[in-house]
Amino acid sequence: MLQGVIDTHQASLRGILATGALVIFVALFLATFQFQVLCLPLINGRKRFELSLTNSKKRYYADAKGFIQSGFSQSKNGFYAITENGRELILAPKFADDIRNDKRFNFHTYREHTMLPNVAGLDLFQLNDLGKKILSHVIGYRLTHNLEWHEVPLRNSLLAVISQQSSRVFLGKKFCRDPTWLKINTDITVLAFRAVQELRVYPNLLRPVVGWFLPACRVLRSEVRKARKIVEPIVQKRRDYKAACLREQTNPEQFLDTIEWAEECAGSQAYDPTVTQLTIALSAMHNTSDFLTQLVFDLCERPNLIEDLRQEIISVRKKHPWGKATIHHLKLMDSVMKESQRLKPIGLVNMRRRAENSVELADGLIIRKGDLLMISSANQWNPAIYPDPDQFDGYRFYNMRQTPDKKNLSHFVSTNVNHIGFGHGRHACPGRFFAAAETKVALCHILLKYDFKLVGEAPPKILAIGSITSANPFAKIAIRRREEEVSLGVSEP
């Protein structure tokens, strides 16, 4: 009898486990289906016998450009596509002005849906209202002294430069000289985006679980713990110091760095100082290092343009003392930067939003509540807008600046429907002014202090991962020290 009870119990347990597994499977299966009738075509959907969107996402990773071109050939206004983030709506560039300042289209909720902040270790991408407020409020390791030609991995070298340069501005001399902090910054910049990329192929329900075992997430959590040991003692020491000054009725020293600005903005509200500092560093470093890498590759192919830029720096430096105002006179450099970004933006699409309500746009196009949407960057390569759009013309925006009605559109930091490298409208990149200044300062040092050229005859191939484009992280350049014609008047950090 006892054996019978045991057998019955085991059978029941197996039944419960089987039922639970079936429920989970069905939930995952149904989560990938779309029951709504779409007003625009869907491309790259599931193929026959595919039960999830995983293969669709992998196909998009491999050939996003082809799918986007195919989509617009079917529907000029836009289309739905299974992207790395699931189903998203890709709209024609003409709709950029319609959504740019419309509060019903929200960048922050889009980010929360796509950057996976619910995965342990990826809370760098999770900003509550206070975090958004702080980030909005707040917003090298030298290449070489070798006189002989030698090869360096450009992307990693520039990432180190940007890490030190940003740390000097944000946190002061102590942080920009701390090799542990600089390594944490560069490692997190690489690991965070790698982790998101790897997790996106998994169904939403599985991502938090997979994140505990994914190597990139595990290392990322370890790096955050290391960062806490650096940031938290400094924050606590300052809080104790201010409390002592308050008791003694003396004026505390004024700290001009992002730690202090975050503290001021947060006030008495609780927040995570370490994650805040890492998020600021991540925001400053990732896109800037990628952009500067591609910019140097572009210049390597155009030695005459390198010389023109050097002459501009020398001319401006002789007329103006080195400082913030000086870089605004580097108009050719500004044009070259904008042209590089035009040809290789950070992605094939931009202006990513989530529709908070159903909205009717021009042409009667209906955007449904909850839709994830983005604008195609296709106007940046449109021959009707930019003559010879496939050709790199460093003087393109310099010449445009001479035309009164186009002058304001020619600046590197300006945004419009024909150039959305920084987005457009109320959610345009708030850090673009700092990024522009940081890039110009770095480029002045590189151009005056180094000769550089490509390794091999072919230019490094731009990498495409889904809708994201990336300067080749594996390519090297040959570089050697040169004697600069003028001093930039900057002491070592």
UniProtKB/Swiss-Prot annotation:
The enzyme's E.C. designation: 1.-.-.-
Gene Ontology annotations of biological process type: mycotoxin biosynthetic process; terpenoid biosynthetic process
Cofactor(s) needed: heme
Entry GO MF terms: heme binding; iron ion binding; monooxygenase activity; oxidoreductase activity, acting on paired donors, with incorporation or reduction of molecular oxygen
Residues annotated to bind heme: 429
An example Gene Ontology CC term for this record: membrane
Top-rank taxon, per record: Eukaryota
Topology in the lipid bilayer: Single-pass membrane protein
Phenotype upon loss of function: Abolishes the production of 15-deoxyoxalicine B and accumulates predecaturin E.
Keyword Membrane belongs to the record: yes
Location(s), subcellular: Membrane
Keywords associated with the record: Heme, Iron, Membrane, Metal-binding, Monooxygenase, Oxidoreductase, Transmembrane, Transmembrane helix
Bilayer-spanning residue ranges: 15-35
EC category: oxidoreductase
Family: Belongs to the cytochrome P450 family.
Function statement: Cytochrome P450 monooxygenase; part of the gene cluster that mediates the biosynthesis of 15-deoxyoxalicine B. The first step of the pathway is the synthesis of nicotinyl-CoA from nicotinic acid by the nicotinic acid-CoA ligase olcI. Nicotinyl-CoA is then a substrate of polyketide synthase olcA to produce 4-hydroxy-6-(3-pyridinyl)-2H-pyran-2-one (HPPO) which is further prenylated by the polyprenyl transferase olcH to yield geranylgeranyl-HPPO. Geranylgeranyl pyrophosphate is provided by the cluster-specific geranylgeranyl pyrophosphate synthase olcC.
Note: The 15-deoxyoxalicine B cluster is a rare cluster that contains its own geranylgeranyl pyrophosphate synthase (olcC), in contrast to other related clusters which rely on a FPP/GGPP synthase localized outside of the cluster.
Stated name of the protein: Cytochrome P450 monooxygenase olcG
Lineage start: Eukaryota, Fungi, Dikarya, Ascomycota, Pezizomycotina
Protein encoded by which gene: olcG
